[in-house]
Curated annotation (Swiss-Prot):
Stored InterPro entries: AAA+_ATPase (IPR003593), ABC1_TM_dom (IPR011527), ABC1_TM_sf (IPR036640), ABC_transporter-like_ATP-bd (IPR003439), ABC_transporter-like_CS (IPR017871), ABC_transporter_C-like (IPR050173), ABCC_6TM_D2 (IPR044726), P-loop_NTPase (IPR027417)
Keyword Cell division annotated: no
Membrane topology: Multi-pass membrane protein
Protein name stated in the entry: ABC transporter gloK
One Pfam family this sequence matches: ABC_membrane
Gene: gloK
PROSITE patterns: ABC_TM1F (PS50929), ABC_TRANSPORTER_1 (PS00211), ABC_TRANSPORTER_2 (PS50893)
Sequence ranges assigned to domain ABC transmembrane type-1 in this UniProt record: 142-380, 752-1031
Gene Ontology CC terms, in alphabetical order: plasma membrane
Domain of life assignment: Eukaryota
Domain ABC transporter: 471-697, 1069-1300
Length: 1323
């Protein structure tokens, strides 16, 4: 006895000591952390009990239940989840990996995150083990044991999942960062917005979804082995039959899924094809959203809708093959779980009947069924987790393939001091000795010795420090085997000089600039530059969806004095005065409502603000009227311009030769991609046939200081102020029933109820056998194996029926419901987007709209179906099992209402926060996607400026911001999972207590109840898993619903008049006192316009930049609404006509060309009305047949990357010629082409549209001198109107504009403007 006392004392002391240690460990130590190391994450500072029971998460739930959450209200993620913690490790491992080998990324991820991944093994292992029995003589001990087991299961299950989700968050952040960093290093020709966005929205998200049950791969196998061992103990040899059923089904499954060769071969291949179809549709949609103004202007919304819908239908058709296989896999997973007990009990009963041994009784039956339930869950989890892992591996492989694509290698040589070209290497070059200053006067050069591709005539032993760019014998093409874009280029540009590159369209001007920037590899020769960085402005200005000021300063800091200098130099000061928020006004995605000139000047201002030593400009003045162009040119590139004063080297590719005499060096490109002439203006003005053909012998306009203070006014920019609202800002109060009803309305109520009935039949087939076993075992207790065939056959019938019904439910959902929902929701989105007013796209972030078409549709297509059937089946199963529990023990019924009330308030409390978190996750992800798209569109600009590292940091900040709601949503789900499992533990303890302390039910009924408790616990756990997935997917439905509701349509009530097929018959256009604005709250852009365009006449609208020219056409096309007045065409008020119908009856050639996502043939003739010969003839007319033949002919895909801007515009002109309508609208259609191409387009329009009404906005006034009438606008008003020649010969405002276009100064312009506004003239 003393020994026992001593042992007991030691044991007690050890327990107390452990308790003290546990208490100290559980005590939070945040108050002990030094201030410099304090972290805002409460989880990181929480103790072990706090983490185990998620107490640290309660404050956020309380806050979310009381108020509306914002991202800034959320906890920060702890250090272990940030990409900073893993950047060096994963970057180093990825650099060392053989990225060309399959699954290289998988290996890198496993090696990097093995610690996080392994952290979930121990708690998961605690859930796995054989059940042990406790003496039923100690009732209270058994009750305590049940409490410990069930609470332990709840805590360990939640902890295991939480550890796993931390791994998912870390991998998600790393994958997105790797994709972005790789994208910034790709060649400009290989970057695809759709590819990278598909990876982020689809593959990365599916990777996370597939990893949620990753530990079930190994844990389920252990549970299967343990369950089979326990069954063998209970049922003996009869368990072999069940084993054969399970093994047979697994083998069948493996045969279907793994293609008998490799795991995931069939499923992975089908998924890959499906994802490629998604990428194709996504690419078309993003291109559509980016060209929305041109699409609306040309009345092409119905064509775009038809093309995009066809891509969506193709995607759905392809996905059916994947879904069919998935239906088979899921059904097979249920075969083993439902049929295994049948075969086991049948074998046991048959052996018992033949040998006369103990029949199947309640104790062995319900114990075995409990084990079978656990076995079935283990088999199902192993199968589903295997499919998920296959999906994850396939997605990782797609990411690896993207990361393995060839990176851009800068082919240039960067040297601070550039050696001059050695004349011995080129017989064309001979040495001379002139300075930079002497280059400006080359009149004495002997033209007979001049060679077009020689720099020796203008450079003789130039000092090394004075050279900025040297190109030697360079030839370049966009891809291997393709035609040379430029050939045999020899060129040197000195520091501080201005070089202009001119030539016809397609001659390689832009290509030469790309070579200088290192964006295009050269096949031969060398390119040497004095700086790796350059301020670059592309032909299509790149703007981001931030304020005007932030677009100008980029990633630099604000220098107020320099900023104001740049703004004034680019003539933006007057624009700022018209903005409601000044230069803090957000301009919208791609500056959708800005005129071309305003976009160009913003981009130019950004280049100037950067203060780089090298500036490269690609036709930045093309969208400006002559007066504005001259003012900006003088301020920037004139003798006193800020680039000249700063000694900046500038290379300007241009189609405008108005100021070419100011260039220090001129490069003339030929149509064959070679330099045909180069030298100073004085050299070439007589020697260059091309330069002479352009008529460049002209004076340069000088702008007086008084004129510089007055310039253009703003047009549509003023609308992008306070209207900028996130598309999801108001939908956090959605009730779930409203969302579910909306989904059911979409798929159809009949379709829905068929699905519910099938699921109910399946649940009945699963649950009723538990009660049937009671009848069977009670009959056996009365008489051994009584009516064995009867009980056994019916027992087998229910599972067979359940399997057949489940197959029907899956097929009904996956093939019918999903396809219908996919078509309907895409149609809702597309209709809403295409019918939205143009102003919507300037006030809404492009990432938010793109998110609807990418992530939201993907959630509905991929996540929602499996979550829906899982939630429906498990919810019905829970209800059925509660009924069975009550049937087994009537006393438990008293606890059910309390449990229901508890669950109701828990879900109410939970949903208030989780609903906000799921929407915040999407809201926080939208800027990340927008930044991603903007980075891809501005890739060349970002790299040229040297902003790659800073944009990577911006991406990192946006990613970390989006990770916060993403991770906390997972935490909220784990909190709910823990709470519900504790509720199940409570119910189980009550049932066990009743069973051990009362005798109100039979053993069989108690067995039914205990079995149902186990099933209820398993199903409740599954319900949490599927319901949280369904909750996220239904969030996508909610966002689509709100997008459709809150996106107003441009079509207004009363706009329902139908037009005859051949309308307009004559083409008479009449403006009657028209005033218009881009939005009800913005400044009017048109004021009291009245004029008439007679049938068959040609009328030009001109004026300075921002005077209202494009807005006049926008009013005619119903892109903006009238505040007063009316516009009629052939006597019909266009405000009564459906807008799309109106636009489709007019021919519009916008400033920015766009393509449909289709072949060249379909782009020219989308309705299939013309033969191949007719299409080729039209291409011949516009001079594009040879170009198109080289690109692959009419059946090649239209691609803006392989055609120059001018070539694209000629293709759009060919499309316009094929249309028979009576009215042609030209919106600065020739502003971005060279003079020869412009003259060609003018001649084609004059010939092909001679009997039609033409209304044209033009900056080059020389192209409209033969028009019947010209209307001059200023500040949205008509100040002059008459015949161009008549106005040109008189002291008119038009004459002053014409003189400015011809390079002559007109000092009285401003006074005349004021005079004309006060009293407009008409001639």
């Amino acid at each position: 006895m003393p020994e026992n006392t001593a042992i007991a004392s030691i044991f007690t002391a050890i327990v107390c000591f452990k308790f003290i240690i546990l208490t100290l460990e559980a005590k939070e130590k945040s108050n002990l952390i030094r201030p410099e190391f304090k972290h805002p994450s409460p989880e990181q500072a929480a103790g072990i009990l706090n983490r185990s029971f998620f107490w640290w998460f309660n404050p956020l739930l309380l806050t979310g239940s009381k108020q509306r959450l914002a991202v800034d209200d959320l906890f920060f993620n702890d250090d272990g989840l940030t990409f900073d913690a893993w950047r060096d490790i994963i970057t180093r491992r990825w650099a060392k990996a053989d990225i060309s080998k399959p699954h290289a990324l998988l290996k890198v991820m496993l090696a990097t995150f093995k610690g996080l991944l392994l952290a979930g093994i121990l708690p998961r292992l605690c859930l796995t083990g054989p059940e042990t029995t406790t003496s039923n003589k100690v009732a209270y001990g058994l009750i305590a044991a049940y409490a410990i087991v069930y609470i332990g299961i709840a805590v360990m299950s939640t902890m295991s999942q939480h550890k796993n989700y931390r791994t998912i968050v870390a991998i998600r952040g790393s994958a997105v960062s790797l994709i972005y960093q790789h994208t910034l290093r790709l060649t400009s020709s290989s970057t695809s917005t759709s590819s990278s966005l598909t990876l982020i929205n689809n593959d990365v998200e599916r990777m996370g979804h597939g990893m949620r049950e990753v530990h079930e791969i190994w844990a389920s196998l252990i549970e299967i082995a343990l369950s089979l061992w326990l069954l063998e103990v209970r049922l003996g040899v009869s368990v072999v039959a069940a084993v054969f059923v399970i093994i047979g089904n697994i083998c069948t499954l493996l045969g279907c899924v793994f293609g008998f060769v490799k795991m995931g071969l069939l499923l992975g291949d089908r998924q890959k094809v499906w994802l490629e179809a998604i990428e194709k549709r996504t690419s078309s949609t993003i291109a559509t959203l980016g060209s929305i103004r041109g699409i609306k202007s040309t009345g092409a919304t119905d064509i775009v809708q038809r093309i995009t819908t066809r891509l969506r239908l193709d995607e759905i058709r392809i996905s059916l093959k994947y879904r069919e296989l998935l239906v088979g896999i899921v059904t097979l997973s249920y075969v083993s779980t439902t049929m295994a007990p049948v075969f086991a009990f049948a074998t046991y009963s048959i052996i018992s009947n033949s040998r006369g041994t103990t029949p199947l009784l309640a104790a062995s039956a319900y114990t075995s069924l409990t084990i079978f339930s656990l076995l079935g869950q283990a088999v199902s989890k192993w199968i589903s987790s295997s499919v998920d892992i296959i999906t994850t591996i396939a997605c990782l492989e797609r990411v690896r393939q993207y990361l393995a694509t060839n990176l851009r290698v800068d082919p240039r040589t960067i040297e601070s001091y550039i050696k001059p070209i050695d004349s011995s290497n080129s017989p064309r070059l001979r040495n001379s000795d002139i300075s930079q200053t002497e280059m400006l006067d080359m009149g004495s050069v002997d033209q007979s010795q001049y060679h077009p591709n020689s720099v020796g005539e203008v450079l003789r032993e130039v000092p090394l420090a004075k050279m900025m760019i040297t190109i030697r014998d360079c030839s370049a093409c966009w891809s291997k085997g393709s035609e040379m874009a430029i050939s045999e280029i020899n060129l040197t540009i000195l520091k501080g000089s201005l070089a202009m590159v001119i030539g016809p369209i397609g001659s390689g001007k832009s290509t030469l600039l790309k070579v200088i920037l290192g964006e295009m590899p050269h096949t031969t020769g060398t390119v040497i530059v004095g700086r790796s960085e350059a301020a670059f402005c592309g032909q299509s200005p790149w703007l981001t969806n931030v304020s005007v000021r932030n677009n100008i300063i980029g990633v630099s800091y604000l220098d107020a004095n320099w900023y104001n200098t740049v703004v004034n130099a680019c003539a933006l000061d007057r624009d700022f005065e018209q903005l409601p928020d000044g230069d803090n006004t957000v301009i919208g995605s791609k500056g959708v409502l800005l005129s071309g000139g305003q976009k160009s000047r913003l981009a130019l201002a950004r280049a100037l603000y950067a203060r780089n030593d090298l500036v490269i400009l690609d036709d930045v003045f093309s969208g400006l009227d002559a007066k504005t162009e001259q003012r900006v040119f003088e301020s920037v590139l004139g003798s006193h311009g800020i680039l000249r004063q700063g000694g900046t080297t500038t290379v300007l590719a241009t189609n405008s030769v108005r100021n070419i005499s100011l260039a220090d060096h001129i490069v003339v490109m030929g149509s064959d991609g070679k330099i045909t002439d180069q030298g100073t203006y004085q050299n070439l003005v007589f020697a260059s046939s091309y330069l002479e053909s352009l008529g460049t012998r002209q004076k340069t306009l000088n702008i007086s200081d008084s004129e510089k203070s007055k310039d253009d006014t703003v047009s549509g920019l003023a609308v992008a102020s306070a209207m900028h609202q996130p598309v999801d800002s108001d939908n956090r109060g959605d009730k779930d029933l409203t969302i579910y009803k909306y989904y059911i309305d979409t798929v159809g109520w009949v379709t829905w109820w068929v699905f519910v009935l099938l699921c109910s039949g399946f649940v009945f087939g699963l649950v009723f056998p538990q009660i049937w076993i009671q009848f069977w075992t009670e009959a056996n207790a009365r008489q051994a194996n009584y009516r064995l065939a009867y009980y056994l056959s019916l027992y087998a019938l229910w599972p067979l029926m359940a399997i057949v019904i489940f197959l029907g439910a899956c097929a009904w959902l996956m093939i019918r419901m999903v396809s219908k929902a996919a078509i309907q929701f895409h149609g809702i989105l597309l209709n809403s987007a295409l019918s939205a007013p143009l102003v919507y796209f300037s006030t809404t972030d492009s990432g938010e709209v793109s998110n609807r078409f990418t992530q939201d549709l993907n959630l509905i297509d991929m996540e929602l179906p499996t979550a829906l059937i899982g939630t429906t089946v498990t919810f019905l199963s829970c209800i059925a099992q509660i009924g069975v529990i009550i049937y087994g023990s009537s006393y438990v019924a008293a606890a059910i209402p309390a449990l229901i009330v508890f669950l109701y308030y828990i879900q109410l409390f939970y949903l208030r926060t989780s609903r906000q978190l799921r929407l915040l996750e999407l809201e926080a992800k939208a800027p990340l996607l927008s930044h991603f798209m903007e980075s891809i569109h501005g890739l060349v600009t970002i790299r040229a400026f040297g902003w790659t590292e800073k944009f990577t940091h911006q991406n990192h900040d946006l990613l970390e911001r989006s990770q916060r709601p993403f991770y906390l949503l997972y935490c909220a789900q784990r909190w709910l999972n823990l709470t519900l499992e504790l509720a199940v533990a409570f119910l189980a303890i009550i049932l066990v207590s009743i069973a051990l302390t009362t005798r109100e039910s039979s053993g069989a009924k108690i067995g039914v109840a205990l079995l149902s408790i186990v099933g209820f616990g398993l199903n409740l756990k599954t319900l949490v898993y599927t319901w949280t997935s369904l909750e996220i997917a239904m969030g996508a439905v909610s966002r689509i619903r709100h997008f459709a509701i809150n996106t107003s349509s441009e079509d207004l009530p009363g706009e329902d008049r139908t037009l005859p097929p051949d309308w307009p018959h004559e083409g008479v256009i009449r403006f009657q006192s028209v005033s218009a604005a881009y939005s009800p709250t913005s400044h009017p852009v048109l004021n009291d316009l009245s004029f008439t365009v007679k049938a068959g006449t040609k009328v030009a609208i001109c004026g300075r930049t921002g005077s209202g020219k494009s807005s006049t056409l926008a009013a005619l096309l119903r892109l903006i609404d009238l505040r007063s007045g009316a516009i009629t065409i052939d006597g019909i008020d266009i405000s009564t006509v459906v807008r799309q119908d109106l636009r489709s009856k007019l021919i519009t050639l916008p400033q920015e060309p766009f393509y449909y996502h289709a072949s060249i043939r379909d782009n020219l003739d989308v309705r299939g009305q013309f033969s191949t010969e007719e299409l080729l003839d039209i291409l011949e007319v516009v001079g594009m047949r040879e170009v198109i033949d080289k690109k692959g002919g009419l059946d090649a895909m239209a691609n803006a990357d392989v055609l120059s801007h001018g070539q694209s515009q000629l293709l759009c002109l060919a499309r316009a010629i094929l249309r028979p309508n009576k009215i042609l609208i030209l919106d600065e259609a020739t502003s971005s082409v060279d003079k020869k191409t412009e003259e060609k387009m003018v001649d084609i329009i004059r010939e092909k549209f001679q009997d039609r009404t033409v209304i044209s906005v033009a900056h080059n006034l020389n192209t409209i001198m033969d028009y019947d009438e010209v209307i001059v606008l200023e500040a949205g008003r008509i100040i002059e109107q008459g015949k161009p020649l008549a106005l040109a010969l008189e002291p008119s405002f038009f004459a002053s504009l014409l003189k400015a276009a011809d390079g002559e100064s007109e000092d009285a312009l401003e006074e005349e403007t004021i005079s004309n506004i006060a009293s407009p003239r008409s001639r």
